[in-house]
């Protein structure tokens, strides 16, 4: 089973927010997911609101889950990708 870390769209019309979820790559964008690891609100003022569970994100990355491009950018800004690469190189 190929697992991806991606965004699940929630919210009202023209006022979206997203949950960062771990899901089977074959599942629909807003369909079934395995685990929720955070959320992302791009509409929040003055800047986008992001909350991520770092431990769960690192666990799923270590197990081979592939992040989408947007999630990879969110992880990079939060410093999660750097920690993952450092842990990978330390092995």
Curated annotation (Swiss-Prot):
PANTHER family per the UniProt record, alphabetical: 30S RIBOSOMAL PROTEIN S16, SMALL RIBOSOMAL SUBUNIT PROTEIN BS16M
InterPro entries xrefs: Ribosomal_bS16, Ribosomal_bS16_CS, Ribosomal_bS16_dom_sf
GO cellular component, one term: small ribosomal subunit
Ribosomal protein in keyword set: yes
Organism: Exiguobacterium sibiricum (strain DSM 17290 / CCUG 55495 / CIP 109462 / JCM 13490 / 255-15)
GO MF entry, a single one: structural constituent of ribosome
Protein name, per record: Small ribosomal subunit protein bS16
Alphabetical list of SUPFAM superfamilies matching this protein: Ribosomal protein S16
Gene name of the record: rpsP
Keywords: Ribonucleoprotein, Ribosomal protein
Matches recorded under NCBIfam families: S16
Cross-referenced PROSITE patterns: RIBOSOMAL_S16
A Pfam family hit: Ribosomal_S16
């Amino acid at each position: 089973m190929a697992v991806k870390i991606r965004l699940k769209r929630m919210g009202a019309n023209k006022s979206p927010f997203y949950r960062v979820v771990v899901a089977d790559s074959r599942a629909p964008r807003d369909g079934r997911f395995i685990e929720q690891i955070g959320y992302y609100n791009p509409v929040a003022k003055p800047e986008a609101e992001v909350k991520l569970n770092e431990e769960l994100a690192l666990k799923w990355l270590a197990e081979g889950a592939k992040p989408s491009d947007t999630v990879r950018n969110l992880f990079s800004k939060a410093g999660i990708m750097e920690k993952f690469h450092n842990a990978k190189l330390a092995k």
